[in-house]
Amino acid sequence: MTNLRKNYPLMKIINHSFIDLPAPSNISAWWNFGSLLGMCLIIQILTGLFLAMHYTSDTLTAFSSVAHICRDVNYGWLIRNLHANGASMFFMCLFLHVGRGIYYGSYLYKETWNIGVILMLTVMATAFVGYVLPWGQMSFWGATVITNLLSAIPYIGNTLVEWIWGGFSVDKATLTRFFAFHFILPFIILALVIVHLLFLHETGSNNPTGINPNSDKIPFHPYYTIKDALGLILMLLILMSLAMFSPDMLGNPDNFTPANPLNTPPHIKPEWYFLFAYAILRSIPNKLGGVLALLASLLILLIIPLLHTSKQRSLMFRPISQIMFWLLVANLLTLTWIGGQPVEQPFIIIGQLASTLYFSLIIIFMPLAGMYEDHLLEPKFP
């Protein structure tokens, strides 16, 4: 069996990736989220596949087909609830994974980081087109509002929006193509995950100290397989609790009403995992400016490696930078809260201040903190 594992071409790849992979001996539970994201992706693809067997992507029957899945299909309610709440778990793990990368300086593996950012954007696109499929009120109006943002692009904006819609409004053509996108994108994500891992295994994992771990490596199996299994059990416990006891807690009540182009919901808001970006979009009272800020809030992750000023990689021994990091986390939680509030005072000004602080922390304060800490650590000879 050992010979087969180490010599058979296909098994050899799996062996080098998940079994005999040399891993740092000191990586903490923050390194569990990569494998949890992999499991989330598998759960989403499997539940999505079973949902797609019963779903119809037609404006007249889409809403009814989702109701049919929940009422008439064996365990359809469970599959649907797992898929909807699985998306929330996916994003929770994704944000923690990115946060870990920023805290411990993992972004200095530039290829791995850049592919990770592309992965995050692809997952966000998949979640957006997926939210449109049940064809409830928030699905329809969410699709209308967000696709309409593209009309802010000078000269080609309106043409581009109508091209994406497949007509003059969000309608049957839009729903059909969104279903096609929602079906194909997870497989593109799967391919990108393999590339992400390929680049990660070129360098090996980072570790909490941020120093070279090559002198002290242990095999991935059994040490980290068992550690990942514990994380997986805890994640499944949370997911199953959500899906079984309060499946609609993170959803929007408006989506229980079939889509009606003649009736706008009082507050159009996306799922919780988009609220921080939505708050940044709304904080600028100009359409094009808002769209650019929205894009910048996500694409800023790509320039984080260029903004690294410290001689140390990790924030483990850098208390001032740690304060900046936790300010950023608190700021993102504030933005998430603001994104779910109506557009009125004091929420407008809080959103604008939080948006300004978001960019300031990443572009100005964190690099300055790194430089200042380096200055403090320079030996002072009398």
Curated annotation (Swiss-Prot):
Keywords: Electron transport, Heme, Iron, Membrane, Metal-binding, Mitochondrion, Mitochondrion inner membrane, Respiratory chain, Transmembrane, Transmembrane helix, Transport, Ubiquinone. Heme b b566 binds at residues 97, 196. Heme b b562 binds at residues 83, 182. It comes from the Eukaryota. A ubiquinone binds at residue 201. One of its GO terms (biological process) is mitochondrial electron transport, ubiquinol to cytochrome c. It is a multi-pass membrane protein. InterPro entries: Cyt_b/b6_C, Cyt_b/b6_C_sf, Cyt_b/b6_N, Cytb/b6-like_sf, Cytochrome_b, Cytochrome_b_C_euk/bac, Cytochrome_b_N_euk/bac, Di-haem_cyt_TM. Gene3D superfamilies: Cytochrome Bc1 Complex, Chain C (1.20.810.10). One of its GO terms (molecular function) is metal ion binding. Its main location: mitochondrion. The chain crosses the membrane at residues 33-53, 77-98, 113-133, 178-198, 226-246, 288-308, 320-340, 347-367. Pfam families: Cytochrom_B_C, Cytochrome_B. Its cofactor is heme b. It is found in: Mitochondrion inner membrane. Binds 2 heme b groups non-covalently. The keyword Transport applies. One of its GO terms (cellular component) is respiratory chain complex III. Component of the ubiquinol-cytochrome c reductase complex (complex III or cytochrome b-c1 complex) that is part of the mitochondrial respiratory chain. The b-c1 complex mediates electron transfer from ubiquinol to cytochrome c. Contributes to the generation of a proton gradient across the mitochondrial membrane that is then used for ATP synthesis. The cytochrome bc1 complex contains 11 subunits: 3 respiratory subunits (MT-CYB, CYC1 and UQCRFS1), 2 core proteins (UQCRC1 and UQCRC2) and 6 low-molecular weight proteins (UQCRH/QCR6, UQCRB/QCR7, UQCRQ/QCR8, UQCR10/QCR9, UQCR11/QCR10 and a cleavage product of UQCRFS1). This cytochrome bc1 complex then forms a dimer. Belongs to the cytochrome b family. PANTHER family: CYTOCHROME B. This is Cytochrome b. The gene is MT-CYB.
